[in-house]
């Protein structure tokens, strides 16, 4: 209802009477007045204006120094280098450069973009479903290929696998613990300012939108902002996934918390593998790298089985019979002990790539039929993970607790094997045209912007839905993809470019 109904207690009675008693109203949510500007509003906007001013001045001075030939004279000065961290032309070149370290894993940028688009489609579909006709969203589960969207939760595991792979790859490539500690500091200093400042942006500017989406049933931006005002410090410490999904600040931030928590425990496995390799060289015993990874995976599987059995949990957050199971989200979906399977698989992939490149492990190129067989197996695993839940999602079959627990375990293992094979095949030259496509330089800028795109896309979904003059109306999954997901992805990368130039890259250079 519009703001004029804020204090009108007769609205419910009037609507009941005009429908001749046929309408039963559970609740009436009034849009209410726009939130008053607080001291934090002015404080935060002062920070943003200051950053914009510094970037503007730095860009002008960069242009002046380049045109006047002063660059060589100034580049050795610390103050100049700090100021140039905010130069928009330089940061733009850093983002859109198609040059990359030859030792880098070039297929990852494309995989990041594909996974991000899949995640964005998941969120867009969920949020439009939280409108005036959620039953239509549930009916979509009757179509077999709808599982491409309805079971796109696996795309998140791709990000965890990539995170584990990059941590492992950089660690074993450098093979020095001290350098790993320095990289940890760099990671925190590069990611955290962009993250926390965007939380501030969300707190300040979301109430200014305050459209129909501010009073959604589940995805309620008003309550999310209130959560952020009281629990933002948990986001800063990367422990916000302790809160439930309803009480959490900025709905997609749980991923960053879990990713950082897995990053904190990664040294346990990295150091164990590293020192076991060192001892094996000195004392000539076989390194048990795979066994170390399998122990971690087994413990994660045990946690999934226990939680699923004890709390009688489903295998997905949304099904036809259970449109929103927050217990599953809070106990399994947002917790590191269930997400470490793809992360550990990524650590194993990173270790293997480094060892093969350094010729510590010698891999002979498999025969063509073996490579084709591996691709078939990987594709079969990925398709099985996505589509095997078809009957379960649409409510046509009830899975036993054992079946649900096994799917929760082996779906993550199967997906990790499939994605891990794609990365290894592209790296070792076993992917043919697939590697040519995934490793194309045009993917590099999109990969560099994927972090900030992930930060901005959730806010942009709220922005676009709040810009409408009525509640969200779900038509179909493909309709939502074309009318909301595509615009959100496009605008997310525009927003990511701005946020990366203004915050992420400058603070990374300053560190």
Regions found by a protein language model. Give the residues of each.
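Aromatic-enriched alpha-helical transmembrane segments of multi-pass intramembrane proteins
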Residues: 1, 175, 230-254, 265-416, ...
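Exoplasmic/lumenal regions adjacent to the first transmembrane segment
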Residues: 1-110, 115, 122-156, 160-163, ...
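Hydrophobic alpha-helical membrane-insertion segments
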Residues: 50-54, 114-122, 190-205, 295-303, ...
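Alpha-helical transmembrane segments of multi-pass integral membrane proteins
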Residues: 50-51, 335-349, 370-505
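Generic alpha-helical transmembrane segments of integral inner-membrane proteins
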Residues: 53, 60, 117, 196, ...
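Helix-loop boundary elements of multi-pass alpha-helical membrane proteins
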Residues: 57-113, 169-193, 264-296, 348-380, ...
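Extracytosolic (periplasmic/ER-lumenal) interhelical loops and adjacent juxtamembrane/interface segments
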Residues: 89, 135-145, 222-247
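Membrane-interfacial alpha-helical segments at the cytosolic side of multi-pass membrane proteins
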Residues: 122-127, 163-172, 202, 262-277, ...
């Amino acid at each position: 209802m519009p703001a004029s109904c804020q204090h009108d207690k007769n609205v419910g009675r009037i609507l009941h009477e005009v429908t001749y008693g046929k309408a039963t109203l559970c609740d009436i949510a009034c849009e209410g007045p726009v939130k008053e500007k607080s001291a934090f509003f002015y404080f935060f906007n002062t920070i943003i204006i200051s950053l914009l001013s510094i970037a503007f001045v730095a860009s002008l001075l960069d242009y002046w120094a380049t045109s006047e030939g002063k660059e060589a004279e100034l580049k050795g000065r610390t103050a100049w280098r700090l100021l140039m961290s905010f130069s928009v032309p330089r940061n733009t070149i850093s983002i859109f450069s198609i040059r990359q370290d030859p030792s880098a894993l070039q297929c990852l940028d494309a995989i990041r973009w594909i996974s991000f688009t899949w995640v964005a489609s998941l969120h867009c579909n969920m949020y439009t479903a939280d409108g005036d006709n959620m039953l239509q969203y549930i009916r979509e589960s009757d179509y077999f290929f709808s599982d491409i969207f309805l079971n796109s939760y696996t795309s998140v595991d791709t990000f965890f696998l990539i995170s584990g792979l990059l941590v492992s790859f950089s660690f074993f490539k450098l093979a020095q613990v001290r350098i790993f500690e320095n990289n940890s500091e760099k990671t925190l200093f590069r990611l955290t300012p962009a993250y926390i400042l965007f939380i501030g942006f969300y707190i300040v500017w979301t109430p200014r939108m305050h459209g129909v989406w501010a009073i959604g049933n589940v995805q309620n931006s008003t309550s999310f902002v209130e959560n952020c005002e009281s629990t933002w410090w948990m986001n800063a410490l990367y422990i916000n996934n302790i809160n439930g999904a309803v009480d959490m600040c900025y709905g997609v931030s749980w991923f960053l918390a879990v990713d950082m928590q897995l990053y904190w425990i990664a040294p346990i496995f990295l150091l164990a593998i590293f020192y076991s390799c060192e001892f094996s060289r000195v004392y000539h015993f076989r390194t048990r790298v795979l066994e170390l990874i399998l122990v971690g995976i087994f413990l994660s599987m045990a946690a999934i089985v226990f939680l699923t059995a004890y709390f009688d949990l489903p295998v997905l957050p949304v099904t036809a019979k259970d449109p929103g199971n927050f217990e599953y989200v809070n106990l399994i979906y947002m917790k590191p002990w269930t997400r470490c399977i793809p992360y550990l698989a990524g650590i194993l992939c990173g270790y293997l790539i480094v060892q093969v490149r350094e010729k510590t492990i010698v891999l002979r190129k498999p025969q063509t039929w073996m490579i084709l067989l591996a691709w078939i197996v990987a594709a079969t695993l990925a398709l099985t993970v996505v589509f095997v839940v078809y009957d379960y999602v649409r409510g046509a079959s009830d899975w036993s607790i054992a079946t649900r627990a096994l799917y929760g375990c082996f779906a993550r293992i199967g997906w990790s094997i499939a994605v891990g094979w794609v990365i290894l095949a592209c790296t070792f030259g076993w992917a043919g045209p697939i590697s040519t496509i995934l490793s194309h330089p045009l993917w590099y800028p999109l990969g560099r912007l994927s972090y900030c795109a992930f930060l901005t896309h959730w806010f942009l979904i709220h922005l676009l839905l709040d810009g409408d003059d009525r509640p969200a109306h779900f038509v179909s999954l493909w309709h939502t993809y074309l009318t909301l997901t595509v615009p959100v992805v496009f605008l997310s990368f525009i927003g990511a470019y701005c946020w990366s130039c203004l915050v992420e890259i400058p603070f990374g250079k300053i560190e």
